[in-house]
Amino acid sequence: EFERQRAKTITALAALDADVIGLLEVENNGYGQHSALASLTGALNKVSAKPYRFIITSEQPGDDAIKVALLYRPSSVSVEGKAAMLLAKPFDWGSRPPLAQSFRHLASNELVTVSINHFKSKGSCPKDAADVNAEQNDGQACWNTLRTQSAKALSDWLHSQPTGVTTDKQIILGDLNAYRMEAPLQYLEQNGWQHLAPKDAVHSSFVYRGRSGTLDHALASPQLKAKLQQFHQNQLFLRSFEQLQPSLDQSWNQ
């Protein structure tokens, strides 16, 4: 099953053909030869005409089982400044420490800082109903306060130019575990970050228990004029939901 899932992931990443890729939920087992990140990058490079490298942080990215990561193509972009992580509250628990790295696009000489993020999910709610992160019955589920604090801290951090490279072209990518009209996204948009999807866009980034929604986002600083094209890694629905010929259905279920 691991090999099957990894092959699907490699196919999706190769099809992106991107110069910089943000990754979520990577096993947090370092950057060595046998680490999950090194293994994934190596497998991707076997099918990619332009090889990738991964960003290595000087600090341990938290103590969670998973982390965020960045891949880049040295043939298209150069690494500028340092790899920066925010480990202080509210990223010491729940929301994974964000990773930021500046890159120079070799063809245009433009600088951009890319931040990959993974905010606390809506699950595993606090047992104490008086907890500020408990379900408030406002449609935002639990841990909304933590996610909003994460959005504020992330915005302030990026404005401080954490990579040591000064650029007004910055982008926030990742799973913010919040819908666009919820407090974390509203804070970011009200504080200068521009969502790269039109407000009336009909799109989704996941399907869960038969319902689709968008918890994954891309927001840019006003100075960064970028085009966003959504790329679904998986089909929205399993093929078993379709009406298949018995022979095809039998083959698929083997």
Set out the residue ranges of the language-model regions.
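Divalent cation-coordinating acidic motifs and surrounding scaffolds
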Residues: 1-254
